[in-house]
Amino acid sequence: MYPFTQQLIKYKSNNFEKKIGMLILDVKGNYYKQVKKFCKIYNREEDLIIIELNGNYKYNPLHKPNLKPSVLANRLKTILLLFSKNNTESFWLDKAEQVLAEAIKLCRLYNDGYVTFNELHKIIMVNDYYLDKLKILREKFNNNYYNHTETYDLLSSITFFEKEFLNLDPRTLSIIKSEITRITNSFIGEYDILKTFSPPLEELNFLGFQDVLENGKIVVLNMNISEYAILSKIISAYLKLDFQSEVMMRLANNFQISNRSVAFISDEYHEYCTETDSNFFSQSREAKCINILATQSYTSLLNTINNQATVKMIIQNLINKLWFRSDDIFTIEDIQKQIGKEDKEKSSHSISENAQKTVFSYLTNSLNSKNSNISETISTSIQTDFIYDTKFFTQELENFTALGFLSDGSKIIPPQKLKLIPYFLYKGGFS
């Protein structure tokens, strides 16, 4: 992944209009160090934005004034699905999405349009806090503070909370709340996390990816999944969804702001892949987005998404592929089908002996044949079989070799075994 990253950072690095804007995700927490080195080499240090705890940037995933509450709530539901891989009952997640949408409406109305995970958590979980905010909303309403649209949102949200949500039986209410707290608790449990991802409005200095696309910035997430298992997945998935939404807006705006190329680089992609990625990868080429992903196997993707059709859509929308040694049968079979079959020459060799009379020799204690003859048969046939068999993927791909399925821009190059140069052994530059 490092050579690809270096080439993209280097590309037109001194040209403000052409240098590439990027989102780089890595849940192991070491990728950002290499990115910093590349940015220093190619004079792009001012373009680098590192999202990390106690860092220089504060990011609130919920502060999207241009997005409807229902869209934000749906993003949160999409992220919840990362932690509900085998959940066959969608009612609880659908209900949690509805509660979040209405809570976001209320929060925007009493908090001057600013929404944080801390506010969402308190307004949903703490009844006294909800009642206190209701008094503020009533006072603003009586003073004609809201326009017609805001008034409608206010009445619909209050109606939902008073007539439906708060009237649910205790068991149903507790289950819905537990679904919501799986996200909100990750942001309010520690002070460092709270001040980084739910800061006051005046402290926000990373507002999203519009600036990344307009000015060619490089956003890197530095958050180790072993230390912050849930939070790193949530932030990674949210950054990815935020980036994808902004990229696709370029098509709607007909590239009026900027037509620079952008890139999405993701190591350990299976940790935060979502079903919406299949649609993005199928359309992002027109939006001039380069997608570079690394995953352990296709089964890893399937384990996260739990939808084989979606996994196949994601795979088929990624044109260039490098396959390394694998023992995963699902991955191998899918690769074999994609590469196809060819006619192979198969030969068989047999030897047979016929005897008219066989007698037993007591002297040698064995059977002796008389008037026997020996015949040998060699046959050759053409059979259709996979170009690369299972043994090739499990045993014949050595370390630092891969099977390449690549395009030259106009056609697919015949798949072939490639020998790769390890980055840590190569002293030159990748360009």
What are these regions (language model features)?
Residues 91-95, 105, 279, 302-431:
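P-loop NTPase motor core of the ASCE superfamily
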Residues 1-289, 391-416, 422-431:
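P-loop NTPase motor domains
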Residues 284-305:
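Sensor-1/coupling segment of RecA-like P-loop NTPase cores
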Residues 26-28, 294-298, 326-328:
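A short beta-strand-to-loop transition that corresponds to the Sensor-1 phosphate-sensing loop
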